[in-house]
Each structure stands twice: as structure tokens, then as C-alpha cells.
Amino acid sequence: MKLKIAFLQLLPVGSLKENMEKGIKACFQAKEKGADIAIFPEMWSCGYIFPHEEASLRECAVSCYGSFVKRFAELAAELDMAIAITFLEQHEPKPRNTVCLFDRHGKMRYCYSKVHICDFGEEDDESVLDAGDDFFVTELDTKEGVIKVGSMICYDREFPESARVMMLKGAELLLVPNACPMELNRLAQLWGRAYEIMLAIATCNYPAPHPDCNGHSTLFDGVVYLPELPDSRDTCVFEAGEGEGVYVAELDVDMLREYRHREVWGCKNRRPEVYGIISERNHI
């Protein structure tokens, strides 16, 4: 099985309505390019630009059952293509940073909210938002077959536990909406993460010149060794440039599954009985 993943590396337009319309157009372009899954960058509803005053923040947020999100559910069914739509979600006591994954039938497979919010003690950080409290993995039905998918959002990448938890829940592919500079070290994180837990990671970022973003959406397939190769291979099978665009990359799921069955990374030699300190707080 091979899946085509569309990275909607787009510049937001401004208003919710304009972003919705531009997102719809991009999804049609993704379908024209043969995509099975389309992923947006982080918090597409507002372009990851949100007010910090409480009343304005609440006004900016949208419901996961409201017209903005519902339109992309309908579009997923219309296009026979899974869509991972991102938005500032209405929630109590505070809004959340959320991605909803709809399958090709328009059914919501999960609604995941960012677990590790960017609370850096800065005026423009995410301290005004609520954090999510779990990671989800679902069986996503595509026209090519079923694949187990989960999501993490931007800063979640910085914590190895995020991807590890979803690997232990059976994930084969992680969809990662993003809004930050994807420079050498952050890209290296993804290289390492895909290698150490043997899964694919698809990250969609905003293009330049969006504030503090530089494109470089990527797909890592997680397959480091092949029997016919004398040495390791590069797991980065796609990297966009800085510019805006709808980019499509292919993931060889059968190759990944065969590799996971053959190799020893990931789960095989884990010893969770000695990892207890990992789930405790503030040891540094």
C-alpha cells in the first residue's frame, strides 16, 4: 500500500471565512494531485495569530462541531480524501489548539488538542490556552487501505514521549501541524524520532514569510535499513522549500510495515520496568 499525503503549506489570508475558502481550494488541489490525506499547518482557522485578551480570544475560537470544521468534514466526503483540519477550538475554561481528522467518508476519527502548550512566560505564548490531556490513534480508512494514524502539534515534537506513546498505541503515521522555524535541529529531531520508533512522520508548516515560520514541511518514512542496501538510507523522503504551495509526497506503507516486522527498533527490547522516572515531574 502506498499513500499520497498533501502538505497544505499555505499563507493565511486573514479572516476565518477567507481562510476557510482558501483551505477548501487547497484541498481540491490536493485531490487533483492524487492525495489520500491532506494536512493543514497549526491552527489554520486564524493562521496561528490569536488575541490574548479573554473576550477577543473566545470570539476567535470555533467549535469542533461548528460551520468551519463541519465544512471540512463535508469536503472530506465530497473529495473521498482524509483531511486534518486545524483550528482554535472553543473549550472551557479556555480555548484549545486542536486538529480534527476526518476520514474520506467525512467521519471524525479524532479531535486532538495540543498536550504541550507553549507556556514560555512571554506575552504572545499559549499560556491563555488549555492543554489537551491525551494522545489518540485511529484506524484511518483510505481508498488504498487502512493505516493507524495519530497527531501531535508543533511543540509536542520536542517531547519524545509524545511520539512514543502513540507508537505504543499502534500508530504507523503521525500527522503534525506546525508553526515554527523548521531549522537544522528541529529537522534532526524528526529524523531521530522516525528512526528510533520506526514510524512515519508528516509535518506541515506555514511558509515564509509567515511570522516565525519558514516552510520545510517534511515526510519521514521511518525506514532506515533495507536488505538490498549496504548502508543506512535517508528516511526523509520529502522536504518542501520555504515557499507557499500544495505539495504531495508518497509514503510506502507496505515497506514500513515489513521493516517494523523485520527490525529490532521501537518496541522489541524495551524495558518499561526501569523507566518509571520518565513519568515523574521536575527532576531537573
Question: Which residues fall in each region the model found?
Answer:
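Cys-nucleophile CN-hydrolase/nitrilase-fold catalytic domain and related Cys-dependent amidase chemistry
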Residues: 16, 25-105, 109-111, 180-197
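A short C-terminal boundary segment appended to hydrolase-like catalytic domains
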Residues: 248-284
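A short, polar/charged loop-to-alpha-helix boundary motif
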Residues: 114-128, 243-259
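Active-site catalytic loop in hydrolytic enzyme cores
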Residues: 90-169, 178, 185-192, 199, ...
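CN hydrolase (nitrilase-like) catalytic-core segments centered on the catalytic cysteine
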Residues: 64-82, 157-247
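Short polar catalytic/cofactor-binding loops
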Residues: 9-16
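Extreme N-terminal starter segment of soluble prokaryotic enzymes
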Residues: 1-6
